[in-house]
Amino acid sequence: MMAATEQKTVYPRYAVIRLRGIPTTPGDIAATLDLLRLRRKFTMVVVVGSPSVMGMIERVNDWVTWGEIDADTLAEVLRKRGRIVGDKPLTLEYLQKWGWNSFEEVALAYISGEIETLACKKDFKAREGQRPPCIPYLKPFFRLHPPRGGLNSVKLHFSVGGDLGYRGPLINDLIKRML
């Protein structure tokens, strides 16, 4: 049990986007992408940068790009690409039903570490009137369009002029091109 003086570690939040397709994906890479819920090309997930998740991202380094997402971009992704179970769009009315005032409030709470995850687990029991620590029934991935203006190369890393691998805060520019 943690003492009252100990702080909970707040890991950075990363957006991870799959850029390479399904054919010729090795089995171990496909399994890791499946664990990250990146089952299709141009699908994005937002993850907490814990050591175990970072190990999975390093393993699929040649299939994805990732970087630190900011609250404004996350709010825009939730507004435009957020889906709830039944493939219905995530709306402001739905958020208000669960006690959230805006997309920006949810995004800021997630980025700051106030809430641990955006999407609740399947067995989450929501109570009316209480604000949950996540968005009930939100799908844990976002389907994006191919980027406007295209990609440089899905065979080279970002550091050498391609698109794969770590790109830091510049991931926000790519996400905005893909909305």
From Swiss-Prot:
Q: Which InterPro entries match?
A: Ribo_uL30_ferredoxin-like_sf, Ribosomal_uL30, Ribosomal_uL30_arc, Ribosomal_uL30_euk_arc, Ribosomal_uL30_ferredoxin-like
Q: Which UniProt keywords apply?
A: Ribonucleoprotein, Ribosomal protein
- Pfam families in the cross-refs: Ribosomal_L30
In its UniProt record, a GO molecular function of this protein is: RNA binding
**Quaternary structure, from the entry:** Part of the 50S ribosomal subunit.
Entry-linked PANTHER family = 60S RIBOSOMAL PROTEIN L7, LARGE RIBOSOMAL SUBUNIT PROTEIN UL30
Q: What is this protein called?
A: Large ribosomal subunit protein uL30
- Native source organism of the sequence: Pyrobaculum calidifontis (strain DSM 21063 / JCM 11548 / VA1)
